[in-house]
Design a protein with these regions (language model features):
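Conserved alpha/beta enzyme-core scaffold
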Residues: 15-156
Length: 156
């Protein structure tokens, strides 16, 4: 019997549920389909729940031009910060890029070596939910009617 954590279901183009086995023999096997330029969602909050083994395997893959979606920009020198340090990440989408120990991201950003898309935490969660549900987008009043809505790049 499959455990609920090891499988997921998806609908085929004919609407038939298909079981997908998510069990792999290693972290590298789990990342076998990730390619240069991929968008990677990395779970966790601060240092809690970070998939360190998968991040280490991602570093070992030596991928480039990644877009990473995470709540923050990494802490210290481990986990997401270690991935950022390799130069593999082109763009970071997050809610909270600046912690007291986010020196790796800070240095990359100040040197214009990484792009940042800052998204309010609730909007980030809703974007992920909407994408997982196959929705094209959603309306949020955040920023509506402000200068930011007219000029998302911050220009006057």
């Amino acid at each position: 019997m499959w455990s609920r954590c090891s499988i997921s279901k998806r609908l085929t183009s004919f609407g038939i549920a298909q079981v997908i086995n998510k069990i792999t023999s290693s972290a590298l096997d789990a990342l076998a389909t990730v390619r240069d330029g991929a968008t990677v969602l990395i779970g966790g909050f601060g240092t809690a729940g970070i998939p360190d083994e998968l991040i280490a395997a991602l570093i070992e893959c030596r991928l480039r031009e990644l877009t990473v979606v995470n709540n923050n920009a990494g802490n210290g020198d481990t986990g997401l910060a270690a991935l950022l340090k390799t130069g593999a990440v082109r763009k970071l989408i997050c809610s909270f890029p600046r912690q007291t120990d986010s020196h790796i991201f800070d240095a990359l950003y100040r040197a214009n070596q990484i792009e940042l898309e800052l998204v309010p935490q609730g909007n980030l969660a809703e974007r992920l939910r909407a994408a997982g549900a196959g929705l094209g987008g959603f309306f949020t009043p955040t920023g509506y009617g402000t200068a930011l809505a007219l000029h998302p790049d911050g220009s006057p």
